[in-house]
Amino acid sequence: MKRLLLTLLLTFPLAAQAVDLENGQKQARSCALCHGHYGQGTPGPASPRLAGTPAGYMVKQIEAYINEERINPRMVITSSLHSISEEAIDDIAAYYESVNLEKINPVLNRIPEWPGDTARGKELYEGDCKSCHRKNGMGKSRKGIPALALQYPRYLFRQIKMFQWDKRVHDDDPEDETFDELTDQDIEALLAYVSSLAPGNKK
């Protein structure tokens, strides 16, 4: 029932007063240790950008860590996820979705370009990613689909490998085969194209 309520809140923004952004910001302090003061993350593979992430998607990922469907013991312990309430999770997710890095500081919104064959990457992206993450890589917030163009390539590389190793489920489908046949060179090409879609990187 609670997850249904969150879905309704995301679908109908006028009901958003049911989540407490101020509490979300307060609760997110433990997240800031790794993900930065504004949730901007770091360019490495371990601390992704949280700012601007759709709340529905973030709630699902937090729950996946709590239920050990995604594994990161250090993160779970540091952020005390097992002791946090569902209300606090909703507030944190809503807070991070509300953070606009471009308005706070455009420098924080920059995504480093990834070297690779962007032509090949575009071909792969349009074949496997565009329908969900949109042509511009900005995702679909109302449907809980994150923006790939606003995430660090090294983190995305690691997550694609996790999908390939069956350490993480893609698109809520354990049978999903989107990444099964991608070589590392294909992944690098895909990320080269995705990073080219980021603000400030578009030619």
Where are these regions (language model features)?
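The canonical Cys-X-X-Cys-His
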Residues: 29-37, 92, 121, 128-135, ...
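Electrostatic cytochrome c docking/interface patches
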Residues: 14-28, 41-46, 97-124, 144
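Axial heme c-ligation environment in periplasmic c-type cytochrome domains
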Residues: 42-49, 65-99, 104-109, 142-147, ...
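Conserved small-residue-rich
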Residues: 118-159
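Short pre-active-site segment immediately N-terminal to redox-active cysteine/selenocysteine motifs
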Residues: 20, 27-30, 38, 54, ...
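Short microdomains enriched in Cys/His and/or Lys/Arg
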Residues: 51-63, 150-163
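Sec-dependent N-terminal signal peptides
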Residues: 4-13
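N-terminal targeting signals for Sec/Tat export/insertion, comprising classic cleavable signal peptides
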Residues: 26-51, 56-64
